[in-house]
Design a protein with these regions (language model features):
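Glycine-rich beta-strand-centered segment in the early N-terminal region that forms part
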Residues: 22-40, 51-95
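NAD(P)H cofactor-binding loop motif with strongest signal on the N-terminal glycine-rich segment
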Residues: 151-152, 220, 243
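Hydrophobic/small residue at the entry helix of a nucleotide-binding pocket
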Residues: 156
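Adenosine-nucleotide cofactor-binding segment
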Residues: 165-227, 274-277
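Glycine-rich phosphate-binding loop and adjacent beta-alpha segment
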Residues: 167, 175, 223-293, 327
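C-terminal hydrophobic helical "lid"/dimerization subdomain
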Residues: 275-327
Length: 327
């Protein structure tokens, strides 16, 4: 038996229930993993609230979470990439990471290097790999650019601050409070804009001598859309990598009127395939961590049983950096 969080209807954090679940033996191509830490990501909130539809069969509901680290307890027939005793992490497993033990496809597992603890790795899998694909694939940064990054003090944001600094990129980051601004700056964000008291477009124009930026990474969505577009240089790129304030709907004529802008809504799934490529991404991330260029530790830790409270904290915007669960 394993303790796991399940939910049977969409709604607030109160729909999350801690239950006992049966965990069987892994089948062909599968592995059983005992979790040491589980990561919270805002996409978990989207699934819980129904913004991202998820099947909730009557009577069985669904697990939650796709990002965790742990140790391989057993492997099924045909599994060669991992073995019993391996420390592993994953970021795009089937829903169900909010659990003590689970069975999942072995192909999603990423071996962890000895120099990175499970606790650190739990903050890196989804969030660090997100920074990798945004900065190295969606809009490959070469160094020397000045960029705008929204929510710079969040879980992905603090890693992005450090990655930008390592690349020689000047990051302008938006934050909601002065305290979060200090945290972002301490992690390598060159300029912070405190949105509760500063005008985003005005400050970006001041910082860039009126030029604007070539790319905006916007995980907020509805509330920052127009500001993001107005901060871009002609032919600039708007990367919509999240919609925490609401979905974004953009008329193509608006992109033309704002300067022949480009827009993309990337999804992690399309940037981590095939498996060999995912492992290369992870190696680049781990190399930065092992070299000390990226430092990542959880800023908030909750017991698995307190997953609902962890969701409340995440949604309240009171947290900075990464939040993890301990099973």
């Amino acid at each position: 038996m394993s303790k796991a969080i399940r939910f049977y209807e969409t709604g607030g954090p109160e729909v999350l229930k801690l239950e006992d679940v049966e965990v069987g033996e892994p089948g062909a191509g599968q592995a059983r993993v005992r979790h040491s830490f589980i990561a919270l990501n805002f996409i978990d909130v989207y699934y819980r609230t129904g913004r991202y539809p998820l099947a909730l069969p009557e009577g069985s509901g669904s697990g939650l979470g796709s990002d965790a680290v742990g140790v391989v307890e057993a492997v099924g027939p045909g599994v060669t990439d991992v073995k019993v005793g391996d420390r592993v992490g994953y970021l795009m497993g089937p829903q169900g990471a909010y659990s003590q033990v689970r069975v999942l496809p072995a192909e999603v597992l990423i071996p962890l290097p000895d120099g990175i603890s499970d606790r650190t790795a739990a903050t890196l899998m989804m969030k660090g790999m997100t920074a990798q694909y945004l900065f190295r694939q969606v809009y490959p940064l070469k160094g020397g650019e000045t960029i705008l990054y929204h929510a710079a003090a969040g879980g992905v944001g603090l890693i992005a601050c450090q990655w930008a600094r390592a690349l020689g990129v000047t990051m302008i980051g938006t934050v909601s409070t002065d305290e979060k601004g200090e945290i972002a700056k301490a992690n390598g964000c060159a300029h912070v804009i405190v949105t509760s008291r500063e005008n985003i477009v005005q400050r970006v124009k001041e910082i860039t001598d009126g030029k604007g930026v070539p790319v905006v990474f916007d995980s907020i969505g509805k509330d920052t859309l127009m500001d993001s577009l107005d901060c871009l240089q002609p032919r600039g790129s708007f990367v919509s990598n999240g919609t925490s304030s609401g979905s974004v709907v953009v008329d193509s004529q608006l992109l033309a009127a704002k300067g022949s802008l480009w827009m993309t809504r990337p999804a992690m799934l399309h940037y981590i395939q095939p498996r060999a490529h995912m492992l290369d991404m992870a190696r680049e991330l781990f190399d930065h961590v092992l070299a000390g260029r990226i430092v990542s530790e959880p800023k908030a830790v909750f017991a698995l049983a307190d997953a609902a409270e962890a969701h409340r904290a995440l949604e309240s915007r009171k947290t900075t950096g990464s939040t993890i669960l301990v099973p």
